[in-house]
Structures are given as structure tokens and as C-alpha cells.
């Protein structure tokens, strides 16, 4: 199973949010420095989110992210504020391994098919942000139907990966909710990366046992609650 340390970028800085709220941001310095820290500790993949994009400025941090992708040279999944096929193509041109489509994929599902056909399904990841079993969109403020149904639709449209985020536990460092993860993995055939609540070695073990492709480590990694080398060891 792959481990993806999170590098979330807001205003040119590496930050972590609680429950996706901008005002909760804790800054951890330069994004490239954070990325190198995790790579030096053994990471061979990163989960990069352009939070300025998620909050409305899709072009912000483009040069920074392009430099980060080039400098690190490892597997990178990239998301945050992608609102058009043109946006997605520009971010894929940075060299990121794959891009994450969330609200845009719900609003325009055919974009998954278009991008998968143009760039290959392995470079298209559909984001399934779930709140109480419903897909959450627009900064997790609205719901748009059963998360399993959407995951299956994204798979049928050609997405090569799914990113599942349990909004109910994201950023709280309280552990994952196993049931919804297992339900999702049991209902699709494409690889699933899990984010939200991964805060202990036992969470990594549970995700591996459940058949997840990968786990995103965010707040718990930056706070020191989970150790990257232990998570990597557990994932092997």
C-alpha cells in the first residue's frame, strides 16, 4: 500500500486545516521544504492540494507546484479547485502523476470521460468526499447523493483512481471510520486512496487489510501523532 504525505498549499505556504476551514490553518513553512522532509524520511509519493484553488483562485501557486513536481520527481496526486477540462489539462502539464477532480466531477461527470480518453485513466482521480454517506461538494457545504453510487459512476466513466475522504473525521486525528471505507472498496474495482482520520499505525494496518491502494497522512503527520517511518513500515 502507498503512503501519501499531504502537502497542502495556501498563500504559498504549506498548511494543515481542520475540517477544511480556512481559518483553522496551521502553517508549516515552505511547501518544497515540507516535501523534501517527507521524501528524506522515506516517502516516494505525495498528495498535493492547491487550497487557494479550492477557495477560488485556481491559477495561484501554479509556478510553485510546477517547481515542486519537477524538483521531487516522485509520484504526485494533485488537486484543489480544478473547475474545467482546461484547468485539468494545465495541471497535468505540470508533470503530476494524476489530478483529482471533486466538485467539478460531480457537476460535469463527462469531464472524467474526456480527460481519461485524452490523458489516460491512470492520470485521472475522482474525489469522493463523503459526509454521512453522502457526497459533499462546494467546500463540503452541500451534499449530492450516495457516495457509493457516485464512485461507481466515476469508475464507469473511466476514472483510474478514487480518492475517498471521510469529511466527518477529516483533520480531527481521531482515527478512520472502517465501515464506509470497506463498503466503498468492496463496490468498485479501481484503486482507492483514503484520506481523513489516518492518525495511527493501526489505521494504516486496517486500510492495508481492507485493500486500499493508499493512505493520505495529513494533520496527524504534521502534529507528530503518527510517525512516517512507522506508517511506511506498516504499509509494506
Swiss-Prot record:
Membrane-crossing residue ranges in chain numbering: none
Keyword match Magnesium: no
Location of the protein in the cell: Cytoplasm
GO biological process, one term: L-tryptophan biosynthetic process
Keyword Cytoplasm set for record: yes
Residues annotated as catalytic: 8 (proton acceptor), 129 (proton donor)
GO cellular component annotations of the record: cytoplasm
Pfam families: His_biosynth (PF00977)
Known EC number: 5.3.1.16
Alphabetized CDD domains for the sequence: HisA
Swiss-Prot/TrEMBL catalytic activity: 1-(5-phospho-beta-D-ribosyl)-5-[(5-phospho-beta-D-ribosylamino)methylideneamino]imidazole-4-carboxamide = 5-[(5-phospho-1-deoxy-D-ribulos-1-ylimino)methylamino]-1-(5-phospho-beta-D-ribosyl)imidazole-4-carboxamide
Family recorded in the similarity comment: Belongs to the HisA/HisF family.
Annotated PANTHER family: 1-(5-PHOSPHORIBOSYL)-5-[(5-PHOSPHORIBOSYLAMINO)METHYLIDENEAMINO] IMIDAZOLE-4-CARBOXAMIDE ISOMERASE
Matching NCBIfam families: 1-(5-phosphoribosyl)-5-[(5-phosphoribosylamino)methylideneamino]imidazole-4-carboxamide isomerase, PRK13585.1
Protein name: 1-(5-phosphoribosyl)-5-[(5-phosphoribosylamino)methylideneamino] imidazole-4-carboxamide isomerase
Species, as recorded: Methanoregula boonei (strain DSM 21154 / JCM 14090 / 6A8)
Chain's gene name: hisA
Amino acid at each position: 500500500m502507498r503512503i501519501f504525505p499531504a502537502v497542502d498549499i495556501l498563500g504559498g505556504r504549506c498548511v494543515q486545516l481542520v475540517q477544511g476551514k480556512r481559518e483553522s490553518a496551521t502553517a508549516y513553512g515552505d511547501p518544497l521544504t515540507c516535501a523534501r522532509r517527507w521524501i528524506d524520511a522515506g516517502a516516494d509519493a505525495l498528495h498535493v492540494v492547491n487550497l487557494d484553488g479550492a477557495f477560488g483562485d485556481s491559477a495561484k501557486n501554479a509556478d510553485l507546484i510546477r517547481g515542486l513536481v519537477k524538483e521531487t520527481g516522485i509520484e504526485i496526486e494533485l488537486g484543489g479547485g480544478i473547475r474545467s477540462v482546461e484547468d485539468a489539462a494545465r495541471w497535468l502539464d505540470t508533470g503530476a502523476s494524476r489530478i483529482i477532480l471533486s466538485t467539478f466531477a460531480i457537476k460535469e461527470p463527462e469531464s472524467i470521460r474526456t480527460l481519461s480518453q485524452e490523458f489516460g485513466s491512470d492520470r485521472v482521480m475522482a474525489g469522493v468526499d463523503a459526509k454521512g454517506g453522502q457526497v459533499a461538494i462546494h467546500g463540503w457545504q452541500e451534499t449530492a447523493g450516495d457516495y457509493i453510487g457516485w464512485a461507481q459512476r466515476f469508475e464507469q466513466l473511466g476514472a483510474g483512481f478514487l480518492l475517498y475522504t471521510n469529511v466527518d473525521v477529516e483533520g480531527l486525528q481521531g482515527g478512520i471510520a472502517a465501515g464506509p471505507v470497506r463498503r466503498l472498496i468492496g463496490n468498485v474495482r479501481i484503486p482507492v486512496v483514503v484520506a481523513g482520520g489516518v492518525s495511527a499505525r493501526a489505521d494504516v494496518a486496517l486500510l492495508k487489510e481492507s485493500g486500499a491502494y493508499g493512505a493520505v497522512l495529513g494533520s496527524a503527520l504534521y502534529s507528530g501523532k503518527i510517525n512516517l517511518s512507522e506508517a511506511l513500515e506498516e504499509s509494506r
